[in-house]
């Protein structure tokens, strides 16, 4: 396998272990195809700008993809756009525009936010509205199998036909039924039954044998996964913890009914990001938008904060925590720039790292993506880098700076440095000269020029 070949270069190490929400265990990660990871993550419903709670899964799964690629996997990463939903329709009606206009506006804003946060575009970005035919075919097959039924133009999934329903949320049907209001939808055979096709004459709709309507949210992802990954069970299905039930539970139910499997081998869930201990939610009005972060420094500080928290736990976000990580990011970027400047000025080029540093990084990451310990490792490397920079030890500077850069590349945290050119090299020499003769006024002016150029 590609991954084993790459890991064996740096020694005999433990393989990647990840927590599987389906089994509630930390398990060794094994793919269906050697060296290839097929991964799907539930994307946004595009009706508004995303807040930093929405951004947490975006950042985490981008980091996961980075790490899988770092250890040698080819990653086929799909994340959808839900571009048909009651919220989109309601906003379109309020503003007197089409659903397509609303969806396009907020999808564009979403990908700009992703890019600003350092998250790369997934390999596949399926749109729900492009798979209506597949969804109707899928629903029809479930009806034929007896797993779904139609009532006056609505189609529901028949939950009690699956003994395994509740496998992801670790609840039995009787317990789940006790928590459901009995008056939600009197057309259902069972309060837990969920909609596959919704009859409607309002907003965007499609013709079907059941009458005009649109698909249920839970069906969209199953059909897109099946189509994109060519009817194969995928390796990882991810999303936020809030999607575990009912959305992901209902995806598994449909996959069990149709294919006899759980859709993915590993189900991963990212904890919530709370604001001062309270759930961040547009409906509560206590949101901080990604758009509120105006500079690359602030965006990367936010990313560093998110990526270094235990991913399955909630984050209690406040300004004090953000400022702490802003200082951390500033420490790393300043040290990295100083190190790269020393190497650049002396024309010292090397891509080497210290074997033990790389082993420590991979061992921590292989422990269910323990980025907290990786951050501690990076802080130790930073101290060693600063010492080497002060001593002018170019070999150690290069190895420590390269390792920090590799870690931050996996984290998706940008480490900016602008290499010297003829002009900035000349200014840098003048700055060193001004400092040596204690012409501090001139030195400050030259430093400002170098800072503006991104050199220091």
How would you describe each model-predicted region?
Residues 5-45, 62, 112, 133-340:
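Alpha-helical recognition segments enriched in aromatics with Gly/Pro capping
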Residues 23-26, 32-118:
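N-terminal, positively charged nucleic-acid-binding surface of large information/translation enzymes
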Residues 69, 115, 143-144, 268, ...:
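Alpha-helix C-terminal capping/helix-coil junction sites
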Residues 73, 147, 455:
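Short phosphate-binding/catalytic loops that engage adenosine nucleotides
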Residues 81-85, 107-110, 120-135, 153-162:
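Short, glycine/charge-rich beta-strand/loop segments that flank catalytic centers
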Residues 93-98, 124-129, 240:
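The substrate-binding groove and active-site-proximal loops of carbohydrate-active enzymes
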Residues 279-281, 287-456:
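Structural preference for alpha-helix termini/caps and helix-kink/transition segments
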């Amino acid at each position: 396998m590609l991954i084993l070949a790459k890991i064996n270069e740096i020694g005999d190490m433990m393989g990647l272990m990840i927590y599987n929400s389906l089994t509630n265990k930390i398990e060794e990660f094994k793919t269906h195809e050697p060296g290839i990871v097929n991964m799907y993550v539930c994307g946004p419903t595009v009706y508004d700008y995303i807040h930093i709670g929405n951004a947490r899964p975006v950042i985490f799964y981008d980091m996961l993809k980075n790490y899988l690629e770092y250890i040698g996997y080819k990653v086929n990463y799909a994340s959808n756009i839900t571009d048909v939903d009651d919220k989109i329709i309601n906003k379109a009606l309020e503003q007197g525009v089409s659903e397509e206009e609303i969806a396009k506006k907020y999808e564009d804003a979403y990908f700009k936010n992703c890019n600003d946060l350092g998250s790369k575009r997934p390999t596949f970005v399926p749109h729900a509205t492009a798979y209506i035919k597949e969804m109707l075919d899928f629903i029809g097959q479930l009806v034929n199998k007896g797993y779904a039924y139609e009532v006056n133009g609505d189609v529901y999934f028949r939950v009690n036909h699956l003994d395994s329903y509740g496998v992801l949320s670790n609840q039995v049907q009787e317990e789940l039924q006790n928590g459901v209001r009995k008056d939600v939808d009197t057309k259902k055979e069972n309060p837990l039954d969920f909609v596959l096709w919704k009859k409607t004459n309002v907003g965007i709709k499609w013709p079907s044998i059941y009458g005009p309507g649109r698909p249920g949210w839970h069906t969209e992802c199953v059909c897109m996964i099946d189509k994109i990954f060519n009817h194969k069970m995928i390796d990882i299905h991810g999303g936020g913890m809030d999607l575990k039930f009912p959305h992901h539970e209902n995806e598994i139910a449909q996959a069990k009914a149709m294919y006899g499997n759980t859709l993915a081998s590993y189900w991963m869930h990212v904890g919530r990001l709370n604001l001062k201990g309270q759930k961040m939610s547009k409906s509560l009005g206590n949101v901080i938008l990604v758009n509120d972060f105006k500079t690359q420094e602030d965006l990367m500080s936010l990313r560093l904060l998110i990526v270094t928290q235990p991913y399955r736990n909630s984050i209690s976000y406040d300004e004090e925590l953000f400022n702490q990580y802003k200082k951390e990011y500033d420490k790393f970027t300043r040290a990295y720039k100083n190190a790269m400047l020393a190497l650049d000025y002396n024309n010292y080029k090397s891509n080497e790292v210290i074997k033990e540093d790389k082993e420590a990084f991979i061992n921590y990451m292989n422990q269910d993506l323990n980025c907290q310990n990786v951050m501690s490792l990076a802080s130790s490397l930073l101290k060693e880098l600063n010492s080497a920079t002060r001593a002018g030890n170019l070999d150690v500077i290069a190895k420590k700076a390269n390792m920090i850069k590799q870690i931050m590349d996996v984290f998706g945290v940008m480490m900016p440095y602008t290499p010297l050119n003829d002009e900035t090299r000349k200014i840098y020499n003048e700055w060193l000269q001004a400092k040596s003769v204690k012409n501090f006024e001139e030195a400050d002016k030259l430093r400002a020029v170098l800072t503006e150029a991104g050199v220091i």
